[in-house]
Protein backbone atom coordinates (compact mmCIF):
# COMPACT_ATOMS: atom_id res chain seq x y z
CA UNK A 1 0.00 0.00 0.00
CA UNK A 2 1.23 3.49 -0.85
CA UNK A 3 2.34 5.70 2.07
CA UNK A 4 0.00 8.72 2.48
CA UNK A 5 2.91 10.84 3.74
CA UNK A 6 5.70 10.30 1.20
CA UNK A 7 4.00 8.22 -1.51
CA UNK A 8 6.47 5.33 -1.20
CA UNK A 9 5.02 2.04 -2.48
CA UNK A 10 6.35 -0.23 0.28
CA UNK A 11 4.71 -0.29 3.70
CA UNK A 12 4.69 -2.96 6.38
CA UNK A 13 1.76 -4.12 8.47
CA UNK A 14 2.76 -3.84 12.14
CA UNK A 15 -0.53 -4.87 13.75
CA UNK A 16 -3.91 -6.21 12.59
CA UNK A 17 -7.04 -6.59 14.66
CA UNK A 18 -10.77 -6.80 14.04
CA UNK A 19 -12.98 -3.85 14.90
CA UNK A 20 -15.31 -4.20 17.88
CA UNK A 21 -18.29 -5.09 15.72
CA UNK A 22 -16.25 -7.56 13.65
CA UNK A 23 -17.15 -5.98 10.31
CA UNK A 24 -13.66 -4.74 9.46
CA UNK A 25 -9.96 -5.23 10.10
CA UNK A 26 -7.91 -2.30 11.36
CA UNK A 27 -4.28 -2.46 10.26
CA UNK A 28 -1.46 -0.37 11.70
CA UNK A 29 1.17 0.20 9.01
CA UNK A 30 4.65 1.69 8.83
CA UNK A 31 6.35 3.17 5.77
CA UNK A 32 9.77 1.65 5.06
CA UNK A 33 11.01 4.95 3.55
CA UNK A 34 9.86 7.75 5.90
CA UNK A 35 9.01 5.53 8.92
CA UNK A 36 5.65 7.30 9.42
CA UNK A 37 2.83 5.17 10.85
CA UNK A 38 -0.77 5.16 9.67
CA UNK A 39 -3.92 3.09 10.01
CA UNK A 40 -5.99 1.45 7.29
CA UNK A 41 -9.37 -0.23 7.58
CA UNK A 42 -10.35 -3.18 5.43
CA UNK A 43 -14.04 -4.09 4.92
CA UNK A 44 -15.98 -6.64 2.96
CA UNK A 45 -17.78 -5.10 0.01
CA UNK A 46 -20.72 -7.27 -0.96
CA UNK A 47 -21.43 -5.38 -4.17
CA UNK A 48 -20.63 -2.00 -5.64
CA UNK A 49 -23.59 0.26 -5.03
CA UNK A 50 -24.53 3.05 -7.40
CA UNK A 51 -26.38 6.07 -6.03
CA UNK A 52 -29.04 7.55 -8.31
CA UNK A 53 -29.16 11.28 -7.61
CA UNK A 54 -32.37 13.34 -7.91
CA UNK A 55 -31.21 14.63 -11.32
CA UNK A 56 -30.73 10.96 -12.41
CA UNK A 57 -26.92 11.15 -12.38
CA UNK A 58 -25.28 7.98 -11.14
CA UNK A 59 -22.28 7.96 -8.80
CA UNK A 60 -20.51 5.21 -6.90
CA UNK A 61 -21.67 4.97 -3.28
CA UNK A 62 -19.15 6.56 -0.91
CA UNK A 63 -19.26 5.24 2.66
CA UNK A 64 -16.95 8.06 3.77
CA UNK A 65 -19.40 10.68 2.50
CA UNK A 66 -22.19 9.00 4.46
CA UNK A 67 -19.97 8.95 7.56
CA UNK A 68 -19.12 12.65 7.19
CA UNK A 69 -22.80 13.58 6.83
CA UNK A 70 -23.75 11.69 9.97
CA UNK A 71 -20.77 13.08 11.90
CA UNK A 72 -21.72 16.64 10.95
CA UNK A 73 -25.26 16.07 12.24
CA UNK A 74 -23.87 14.57 15.46
CA UNK A 75 -21.13 17.18 16.00
CA UNK A 76 -20.87 18.19 19.67
CA UNK A 77 -23.52 15.64 20.65
CA UNK A 78 -22.81 13.06 23.39
CA UNK A 79 -22.71 10.06 21.05
CA UNK A 80 -19.89 7.50 21.28
CA UNK A 81 -17.82 7.20 18.06
CA UNK A 82 -18.28 3.42 18.14
CA UNK A 83 -22.03 3.92 18.10
CA UNK A 84 -21.70 6.19 15.06
CA UNK A 85 -19.65 3.52 13.28
CA UNK A 86 -22.30 0.90 14.10
CA UNK A 87 -25.00 3.23 12.73
CA UNK A 88 -23.10 3.67 9.47
CA UNK A 89 -22.45 -0.07 9.19
CA UNK A 90 -26.15 -0.75 9.79
CA UNK A 91 -27.21 1.67 7.06
CA UNK A 92 -24.69 0.24 4.59
CA UNK A 93 -25.79 -3.31 5.38
CA UNK A 94 -29.42 -2.36 4.76
CA UNK A 95 -28.44 -0.90 1.39
CA UNK A 96 -26.32 -3.91 0.43
CA UNK A 97 -28.92 -6.44 1.52
CA UNK A 98 -31.68 -4.74 -0.47
CA UNK A 99 -30.54 -6.73 -3.50
CA UNK A 100 -30.50 -3.59 -5.63
CA UNK A 101 -27.33 -2.31 -7.28
CA UNK A 102 -28.76 1.17 -7.90
CA UNK A 103 -29.99 2.97 -4.79
CA UNK A 104 -31.94 6.26 -4.95
CA UNK A 105 -30.27 9.01 -2.90
CA UNK A 106 -33.68 9.66 -1.34
CA UNK A 107 -33.64 6.15 0.20
CA UNK A 108 -30.22 6.76 1.73
CA UNK A 109 -31.39 10.08 3.19
CA UNK A 110 -34.50 8.48 4.66
CA UNK A 111 -32.47 5.65 6.22
CA UNK A 112 -30.10 8.18 7.80
CA UNK A 113 -33.02 10.22 9.15
CA UNK A 114 -34.70 7.12 10.56
CA UNK A 115 -31.46 6.05 12.26
CA UNK A 116 -30.70 9.52 13.65
CA UNK A 117 -34.25 9.85 14.99
CA UNK A 118 -33.65 6.75 17.12
CA UNK A 119 -30.29 8.04 18.38
CA UNK A 120 -30.47 11.81 18.88
CA UNK A 121 -33.31 14.27 18.23
CA UNK A 122 -31.01 17.26 17.71
CA UNK A 123 -28.91 15.42 15.12
CA UNK A 124 -32.12 14.26 13.45
CA UNK A 125 -33.33 17.86 13.05
CA UNK A 126 -29.89 19.05 11.90
CA UNK A 127 -29.73 16.38 9.21
CA UNK A 128 -33.34 16.97 8.16
CA UNK A 129 -32.69 20.71 7.78
CA UNK A 130 -30.00 20.05 5.19
CA UNK A 131 -31.58 16.98 3.58
CA UNK A 132 -34.98 18.64 3.20
CA UNK A 133 -33.39 21.99 2.29
CA UNK A 134 -34.96 24.18 4.99
CA UNK A 135 -34.79 27.82 3.95
CA UNK A 136 -36.17 29.67 6.97
CA UNK A 137 -37.43 29.31 10.54
CA UNK A 138 -40.91 28.45 9.26
CA UNK A 139 -39.55 25.25 7.71
CA UNK A 140 -38.16 24.25 11.11
CA UNK A 141 -41.47 25.03 12.81
CA UNK A 142 -43.44 23.01 10.28
CA UNK A 143 -41.06 20.06 10.58
CA UNK A 144 -40.97 20.15 14.38
CA UNK A 145 -44.76 20.55 14.53
CA UNK A 146 -45.14 17.41 12.44
CA UNK A 147 -42.70 15.57 14.70
CA UNK A 148 -44.57 16.65 17.84
CA UNK A 149 -47.88 15.51 16.33
CA UNK A 150 -46.49 12.09 15.37
CA UNK A 151 -44.91 11.70 18.82
CA UNK A 152 -48.27 12.47 20.50
CA UNK A 153 -50.10 9.96 18.31
CA UNK A 154 -47.45 7.32 19.14
CA UNK A 155 -47.88 7.97 22.87
CA UNK A 156 -51.69 7.81 22.74
CA UNK A 157 -51.74 4.42 20.96
From Swiss-Prot:
| The ATP-cone domain, residue ranges | 49-139
Q: Which HAMAP family match?
A: NrdR
Q: Which gene encodes it?
A: nrdR
The record's function comment reads: Negatively regulates transcription of bacterial ribonucleotide reductase nrd genes and operons by binding to NrdR-boxes.
Q: Which cofactor(s) are needed, names only?
A: Zn(2+)
Q: What is this protein called?
A: Transcriptional repressor NrdR
Q: Name one GO molecular function term.
A: zinc ion binding
Q: Return the PANTHER family for the record.
A: TRANSCRIPTIONAL REPRESSOR NRDR (PTHR30455:SF2)
Q: Where do the ZnF regions (unnamed) fall?
A: 3-34
Q: What biological-process terms (Gene Ontology) are attached?
A: negative regulation of DNA-templated transcription
Family of the protein in this entry: Belongs to the NrdR family.
In which organism is this protein found? Granulibacter bethesdensis (strain ATCC BAA-1260 / CGDNIH1)
Q: Describe how the cofactor binds.
A: Binds 1 zinc ion.
User: Do you know which InterPro entries this protein is assigned to?
Assistant: ATP-cone_dom, NrdR-like_N, RNR_NrdR-like
Keyword tags: ATP-binding, DNA-binding, Metal-binding, Nucleotide-binding, Repressor, Transcription, Transcription regulation, Zinc, Zinc-finger
Amino acid sequence: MRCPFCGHEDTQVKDSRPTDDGTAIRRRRSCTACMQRFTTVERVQLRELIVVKTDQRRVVFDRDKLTRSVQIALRKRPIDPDRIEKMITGIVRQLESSGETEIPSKLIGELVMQTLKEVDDVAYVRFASVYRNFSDAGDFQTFLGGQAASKESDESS
